[in-house]
Amino acid sequence: MDSDGDDYVMSGSDQEYDDEEREILEDLRKQRKKPHDPVQEVLGFSDDDDDDDDDDEEEQQDVAELMRDSDIEGAEDDDRDLPNTMDWGSKRSTYYNTDFVDQDYSSYNAQEEEQARAEEEEAKKIQLRLAKRMSEADFQLDNVEAAPAGSSDDNELSHITKVTSDLAGLSERERRQLMHSESPEFIILTQDFQQHLDEVKNLLKPVLNYVRKHDVPMVPALQYAGLCHTVLTTYCSNVAFYLLLKARRIDVKAHPVIRRLVQLKDLIEELKPRYEEYIRPQLEALLERIEDGDAFTVLDVAQRKAKLQILNKYNDGQQASVSSDDDDNDDDDDAESKEKDLQEEAGEEEEEEDARRGITYQMAKNKGLTPHRKKELRNPRVKHRGKYRKALIRRKGAVRTVRKELQRYGGELSGIKAGVTKSVKFRT
């Protein structure tokens, strides 16, 4: 057999194989016969000479296939029983259950550690072999071509984002029709822009500036006006951005500004009824007074009319009493007590005005037509306590109670006096 294999001619002789090749061929035949013929042949013979020729051809094919087999490094090597490092193997279970995760560390033994180390070394060998196969051509970008400057995508994008600029040959009517077809919202937005801008400029802004400048308390009406001012200015700024995009002839159908304008438009429609009915008339009246130069203050809405009337009456009476006698301290005390009483009455009246009328005792108890009972019998605890007290009184009449000694005689504390007699005489 030639090393190149180009001048190889098949022959029917067994002399071409050496002992090592015959052993390999015999092993290969046994492996092929095992799955197909479980019964081993003891004395096999052939009746025809043609079978020998067929066997020779089969041997040649087996040797050629054996030489190409990935499990054999080469016929001239001594390590014929070692598998090739490039061989994938024939067992699928080899490629499963080889990785370890966190929960597998508890059952990690020395054998598995050795297998993991061998797997790591094999991976490093494969990585090194792949790195050796790479050349400088693998790191070049020869097969990646740059897109041309005037690509079709850019042309399509320019057609999408820009409107046709050839309007010189169109009439005024055709221009209006083109504008209505391409941007029907343009006229509505421009009208809203002018209307809201005038509202902010002529009414909302002057009033709010005066309020902030003179530290006027922000009552709910002014807070609502400030909210309307913020919403309208935001809407006008978005409309201005929309007009800027239209001036640059950029298509705004898919632009986020359209969605934002719709949201602000809905919010303005929600605020408009209350603003037109309540807030705007008050702002107009307030603006007239500001322009006239009238000085005004915002009253405390928490004050009640009844309380103001009572305090005014008391102040008038107090001024009269103070003017008559300023040095009388008793009158001052009486005035303070009267003021306190009047304030309490005003507080009660204020509570009565705010709260509902309370229910009566009969409504709360809801007894109906229950029979009258003594007060002592209403509470069982009080009832049994009274019975016990009466039983003690009856027992004292039948059985004498035991009287314990209060204090024993401990001798005279200051000595014995001859003229003092404290003994008890026995009467006969």
Swiss-Prot record:
What are the entry keywords? Chromatin regulator, Developmental protein, Nucleus, Phosphoprotein, RNA-binding
GO annotation, biological process: chromatin organization; maturation of SSU-rRNA from tricistronic rRNA transcript (SSU-rRNA, 5.8S rRNA, LSU-rRNA)
Q: Which InterPro entries match?
A: Sas10/Utp3/C1D (IPR007146), Sas10_C_dom (IPR018972)
| The UniProt record lists the keyword Phosphoprotein | yes
- Pfam entry (one): Sas10_Utp3
Bias (Acidic residues) ranges: 15-24, 46-62, 324-336, 344-353
Q: Where is this region: Disordered?
A: 1-93, 317-386
Where is composition skewed (Basic residues) in this entry? Answer: 370-386
A GO molecular function term, named singly, is: RNA binding
PANTHER family, sorted: SOMETHING ABOUT SILENCING PROTEIN 10, SOMETHING ABOUT SILENCING PROTEIN 10-RELATED
Function, as annotated, reads: Essential for gene silencing: has a role in the structure of silenced chromatin. May be involved in gene regulation during development. Binds RNA.
What is the name of the protein in this document?
Something about silencing protein 10
Question: Taxonomic lineage of this organism?
Answer: Eukaryota, Metazoa, Ecdysozoa, Arthropoda, Hexapoda
UniProt lists the gene as Sas10
